[in-house]
Amino acid sequence: MGIILSIIFVICILVVYDLCLSKYGLVCTDYTVKNSKIHTEIRIAQLTDLHNSIFGEDNKRLIKKVADQNPDMICITGDLLNMDINNVNIALNLISGLSKSCPVFISLGNHEMNYRYSDLNELIKKFEQAGATVLNFEFQDLKIKGETIRIGGLYGYNLQTANEACHDDEVEFLSNFQN
């Protein structure tokens, strides 16, 4: 009986450790994507599903970790907020801190789309005032290091891969994005 309780205790400790690591740990993963149309290295930092997480006072650990990667642009791809927490200041301070080193672009996720404490247009305005460009069903052509690249924001939670399964506006957006 004592061995079983010890094993259960160790498993509980490991689960708590893993949960803390996933909530408060910062991990950078590098990916190299080659494109025949781009001849210069462009570094993009991509953040997603932060859900109002805080990494150090005023998110300084996260801001430093991103800045240390020396990105040319930062893309936040949804769920910067937690839809049921009435505190947008965590996100605004993060955007403000990140935007000091390079441009920040945001594509909205379901937590922004369904945020309970603010109208969507007001939320977008706050993100933009903090220093981000919000791409909500739109795209933008950018010049970075002499290269023209197109980025866009499309909210399509569980977006289907087959055109016939997508909404007409999503198909139109993706078609225009490719051109």
Question: What is the predicted function of each stretch?
Answer:
Residues 37, 52, 112-179:
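Conserved catalytic scaffold of divalent metal-dependent phosphoesterases
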Residues 23-56, 173-179:
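Mobile, glycine- and charge-enriched loop segments
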Residues 40-136, 140:
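Membrane-embedded segments
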Residues 34-38, 65-67, 152:
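Short beta-strand-to-loop junctions in surface cap/lid or active-site-entrance loops
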Residues 1-38:
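N-terminal membrane-anchoring alpha-helices
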Residues 21-23, 50-55, 81-85, 157-165:
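Short, flexible loop segments at the rims of nucleotide/cofactor-binding pockets, characterized by
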Residues 1-3, 11-17, 43-45, 74-76, ...:
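A generic short-segment signal for beta-strand/edge and adjacent turn/coil regions
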Residues 6-13, 23-25, 84, 112, ...:
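A short linear-motif detector with a strong N-terminal bias
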